[in-house]
Amino acid sequence: MSIPDDKEAGTIDEFLQKEGVLDILQKLDHDLVGLKPVKDRVREIAALLVVDKLRSRLGLTGTTPSLHMAFTGSPGTGKTTVAMRMGQILKAMGYSRSGHLIVATRDDLVGQYVGHTAPKTKEVIKRAFGGVLFIDEAYYLYNAANDRDYGVEAIEILLNVMEEQREDLVVIFAGYEDRMNKFYSYIPGISSRIGNHISFPDYTLEELVDIAKVMVRDMEYRIADDAIPACRAYIEKRMQMPYFSNARTVRNLINRARMRSAIRIFNKAMDPNADGLVSRDELMTLITEDFPTVQELLERGETAIVE
């Protein structure tokens, strides 16, 4: 087989620019605060795909690497966001027809009676063809305590599709790392089909505060400088409590602060002794009293924990 001149391949930078991969990676940086190990792994996968494409253009032999993945980590650490961006990368580089993301759980795949599971699972897979199927908390597909559980049928269908139609579907399993490892021990065929494992660490306190700032900015709000300590104190205490969900908990906090801000502004506007005027800056700024205090968090007890 003749090999084309090296110039036909172009530089990797030119390839990344032309295919839009650099833009997608930059969006990932914007979407996610911190998570450097995750971003590095995504870049490694992108690099492998880029080199594979360049080799193909030069007539060099090669095989498409396994693109099925496992994302492990706590809730709210960006797994779904990374899955969405990964789908876009795969589409940009020609490894996926559309790159769209379908998110599914056990309820979407497993039926409640005999003959119900296969149609449900196949319908979800059909919608995901050409893109990425993201199965959240995948370990719930298998119930070790019930050998007649219908989840086994869904798993068998998934395993077959992952092997026989891997060029038209990327499957990403997600969940807590310890539970995923146990899941692999029950269903060894899954682990052998996964080519890329990405671990998502919990955010640090300062990263969560930065996430809060990004969230309000995207909503066209801002946190007043003297309100940052109140925001930080709430997050720090919440991190020590059960059911903490990283960025999801921060989003809940911001939504609560927005609600308190709205009530504060509304009450001020309705005050008969006030002029009723509301400035743009007031509408955009979250102040200290808009953030629940640590004492309020503790007094609310379980209602705060189960967000």
UniProtKB/Swiss-Prot annotation:
GO cellular component, one term: chloroplast
Function (record text): Required for the expression of ribulose 1,5-bisphosphate carboxylase/oxygenase (RuBisCo). ATPase involved in the activation of red-type RuBisCo, which tends to form inactive complexes with its substrate ribulose 1,5-bisphosphate (RuBP). Catalyzes the release of RuBP from inhibited RuBisCo in an ATP-dependent manner. Activation of RuBisCO involves the ATP-dependent carboxylation of the epsilon-amino group of lysine leading to a carbamate structure. The nuclear-encoded subunit plays a more critical role in activase function than the plastidial-encoded subunit.
Species for this entry: Cyanidioschyzon merolae (strain NIES-3377 / 10D) (Unicellular red alga)
Effect of residue 137 to Q: Abolishes ATPase and activase activities
Chief site of localization: plastid
This protein's name: Ribulose bisphosphate carboxylase/oxygenase activase, chloroplastic
The organism's taxonomic lineage, starting at the top: Eukaryota, Rhodophyta, Bangiophyceae, Cyanidiales, Cyanidiaceae
Disulfide bonds listed in the record: none
UniProt keyword annotations, A-Z: ATP-binding, Chloroplast, Nucleotide-binding, Plastid, Transit peptide
Subcellular location: Plastid, Chloroplast
